[in-house]
């Protein structure tokens, strides 16, 4: 298991980690992260392969946890869909069905529902994670 910890860079979305393998087309792809230490905010989800790290916020489909509260982030639009909160020890799972074009998430085994059901199936996607606050630490499971 690998750990991602932001140790410098201040408060900014500048600690992006991108997956090194594309999601498998026509399959259900899943991966999990565990929050080890939550100082502030993280984002996690999927982005198109080959994206410029500086453009992640414009192209991401995923959640932002702002001090543990979940905000939906879909291609630059942010809304608050859930009243649940993540904290240290929480396990967050991303589930991508590239056959049906559906993206969903779970926290600690509890399904958070369908995030979106219109993923473009012809694009190659990779997992991503970004950390805003120094000291925040996440384990890749």
Predicted feature descriptions by range:
Residues 1-141:
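PRY/SPRY (B30.2) beta-sandwich protein-interaction domains
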